[in-house]
Amino acid sequence: MAALPPGKTLQDKHYVGFSQGDALIAVMDLILDYPSPGTAMIGFFMVDISCQGRGTGTQIIAQALEALAAQGMTKARLAIDEGNPQSRAFWLKNGFVLTGERISNDIAAYLPMERPLRHGANEPN
């Protein structure tokens, strides 16, 4: 959660919690204007297991992307673990596409995904 891309500080990182009643059901971390101006980089998004498989994550992502578009962001970007087909399916369902890039480190390989943002047009597919 403390990992930062080059040129960014903790002040650039945003942590967002999503609740249902009094219960925290999802969390997201993101950095705005990275890797380029107008891009919102989603570092992670996790939904409580009790809320998975019911469309909750998709609803949250639609609302979050709409809020980002309203703030002037024009693109959302993230990177999935190459070995996580569930993550890939979730983000594809939510309008993200693979960029064709592959990023590797000592731990895993990651596949960047992106989707354009337009205020008023960020409902799930």
Residue ranges: model-predicted function:
Residues 1-50, 61-63, 67, 71, ...:
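Acetyl-CoA-dependent GNAT
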Residues 37-39, 75, 108-110:
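A generic structural signal for beta-strand entry/edge sites
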Residues 53-58:
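Glycine-rich acyl-CoA binding loop
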Residues 78-88, 104-109:
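Conserved beta-strand-loop-alpha-helix junction that forms the acyl-donor binding cleft
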